[in-house]
Structure formats: structure tokens, C-alpha cells
């Protein structure tokens, strides 16, 4: 499995979410709404999720293996850093469509 494309939108918010990404896997499958979060130990990638009726968040899609999770995180964070250096990222207000 290879991440063959990463699209990134930075968000202007006071919270910890810094960007929203979409990835393409093997030129065949797209996953939207992957979030770049500024955590206590640095940036990390959170997979798309939805809130359950009891208030918990459940992943909608997620990698099965830690190796696949690492590939996704590496690709998304590399694009986040690259785009930030080039300042070629679309910024939007959090919650904007």
C-alpha cells in the first residue's frame, strides 16, 4: 500500500486541529477528513471519526496495522511541513464548508 496523493487544507482555529487532509491510496481509494492535530508530544494524524450517541468518537476508517498507520502519518505530516514551508496551503476558518 502506498499513499499516492495528499491534499491538505490548514484551518485557522485556536484549538489543536491544524489541518484537514485527504489521501489517495494506490491511485484507487480516497480517505477524506483526516485531521492533523497538535498534541502534547507534537503533531499527529487522527483518522476520520464520528460522535456516538454516548459522546464517544469512533473511527470511520482506520489502518489495521501500525506499519500502515505510520505510512499515512508520515505522508500527511510531510505534506503539512512541505506546504507550510512553501506557504501554498488553503487556509479556512474552522467549520467552514
Swiss-Prot record:
GO terms for biological process: division septum assembly; sporulation resulting in formation of a cellular spore. Transmembrane segments: none annotated. InterPro entries: SpoVG, SpoVG_sf. Keywords: Cell cycle, Cell division, Septation, Sporulation. The keyword Secreted does not apply. Pfam families: SpoVG. Gene3D superfamilies: Stage V sporulation protein G. PANTHER family: SEPTATION PROTEIN SPOVG-RELATED. Essential for sporulation. Interferes with or is a negative regulator of the pathway leading to asymmetric septation. Belongs to the SpoVG family. This is Putative septation protein SpoVG. It comes from Halalkalibacterium halodurans (strain ATCC BAA-125 / DSM 18197 / FERM 7344 / JCM 9153 / C-125).
Amino acid at each position: 500500500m502506498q499513499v499516492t496523493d495528499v491534499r491538505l487544507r490548514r484551518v485557522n482555529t485556536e484549538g489543536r486541529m491544524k489541518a484537514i487532509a485527504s489521501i489517495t491510496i494506490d491511485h484507487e481509494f480516497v480517505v477524506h477528513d483526516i485531521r492533523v492535530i497538535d498534541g502534547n508530544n507534537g503533531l499527529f494524524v487522527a483518522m476520520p471519526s464520528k460522535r456516538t450517541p454516548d459522546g464517544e468518537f469512533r473511527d470511520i476508517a482506520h489502518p489495521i496495522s501500525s506499519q500502515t498507520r505510520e505510512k499515512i502519518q508520515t505522508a500527511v505530516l510531510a505534506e503539512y511541513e512541505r506546504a507550510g514551508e512553501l506557504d501554498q496551503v488553503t487556509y479556512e476558518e474552522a467549520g467552514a464548508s
